[in-house]
A protein has these predicted regions:
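Conserved beta/loop motifs at nucleotide-recognition and modification sites
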Residues: 1-347
Length: 347
């Protein structure tokens, strides 16, 4: 929880500094919300780099193969017709630099020019601070501001979704927006093309759940939720149909099994919640849910299952997981279909 508060604080401070025109010198941009990250990179560029002078004042380089000597040389270049320069370095894993390069980076941070803004962007590489490298960790903690772009809060995301749909000539209410988030995930990067697709398909002014279900491309978790809901109702045909859709998308059977197991664990905890008098808020806290929508769906599905069924289902998943990881030549797709049949028969 403390980590989340620190990450949120860094993000909010960055936004405030950007708005006030008091941007710092060195930033580390990380987190899975790439849409938001790219948006703010453009905003920083607008703030610091005058149009027409990008060639002199803005440099975006790949981190792979970049030396700290080259980076230092870029930071020392004076701005032209501007107060500051902007350098964006993508996927330079700072904690995997060799000792000499770490030393040069520390020296650069200790005497960093005020007229330069340097942003290390972690896109495909995950940012993992490593306290083993004490001097580098201390230098980055002191001189660089970490800005973590995470999925937005429920209310902020619903408002953003509504604005995007208004741009397509449609409205969407909060409950329908929650269904979209559940179906397509909560990352803006993934939602943008889905909103455009749904906006082009919808006939009425108001977007409906049916519009979303008709054309949206659901994320793996959403499909598996529908699959487990089908087996709790004993509907093997529907569960098998959904499994077939995932396999056509080239999803790995071991990955599908992992998500099925996770969903059944969530269903088990929902059953425990019902049996012990706990509510959706307990489930939301347990599974770190940003919205009560999936919690309500879980409780609804749990009412159709028993404690014994949940325990037996998890045992079947664990057994198949061990077999998939240890047996050679196993028909993984066939075993998944058999698992769904067993789950549906016991429901």
């Amino acid at each position: 929880m403390a980590e989340k508060k620190t990450a949120a604080k860094g993000y909010q401070k960055f936004k405030a500094d950007l708005a006030a025109g008091t941007l710092g010198e060195v930033y580390i941009f990380c987190g899975e919300e790439s849409y938001l990250r790219e948006y703010y990179l453009k905003e920083v560029q607008k703030k610091l780099v005058p149009a027409g002078f990008e060639e002199f004042n803005f440099h975006r380089v790949a981190g792979k193969g970049l030396t700290m000597e080259e980076l230092t040389e870029m930071t020392e270049a004076m701005p032209m017709m501007a107060e500051r320069t902007l350098i964006v370095v993508t996927d330079c894993d700072l904690y995997k630099l060799g000792e000499e390069q770490r030393t040069r980076l520390i020296a650069l941070l200790d005497d960093f020019p005020e007229y330069c803004c340097l942003i290390f962007v972690y896109d495909l590489v995950e940012y993992k601070p490593n306290k083993t490298y004490k001097k580098l960790y201390a230098a980055l903690s002191d001189k660089a501001q970490e800005v973590r772009f995470e999925p937005q809060d429920k209310s902020d995301l619903i408002n953003w979704i509504a604005r995007r749909f208004r741009a397509t000539g449609h409205d969407i209410d909060a409950r329908t927006a929650e269904h979209l988030m559940f179906t397509c995930g909560s990352l803006m990067t993934g939602l943008v093309p889905e909103i455009e697709k749904i906006g082009a398909y919808a006939k009425g002014r108001a977007v409906t759940v049916e519009d979303i279900n008709a054309v949206a491309d659901p994320v793996l978790d959403a499909v598996v939720f529908d699959m487990t809901s089908a087996v709790t109702k004993g509907d093997y045909d529907r569960a098998s149909e959904l499994l077939g859709q995932l396999l056509k998308k080239q999803e790995e059977p071991i990955m599908i099994l992992g998500v099925i197991s996770k969903e059944l664990r969530r269903l088990y905890t929902a059953r425990l919640a019902l049996d012990s008098g706990k509510d959706k808020l307990w489930l939301m806290d347990l599974w770190n849910m940003r919205s009560d929508y999936p919690a309500r769906l879980l409780l609804e599905a749990a009412r159709k299952s028993t404690h014994e069924w949940c325990v037996n289902s998890l045992a079947l998943c664990q057994k198949l997981d061990r077999r998939m990881k240890s047996e050679k030549g196993i028909d993984r797709e066939g075993e998944l279909k058999l698992l769904l049949m067993q789950l549906a028969q016991r429901a």
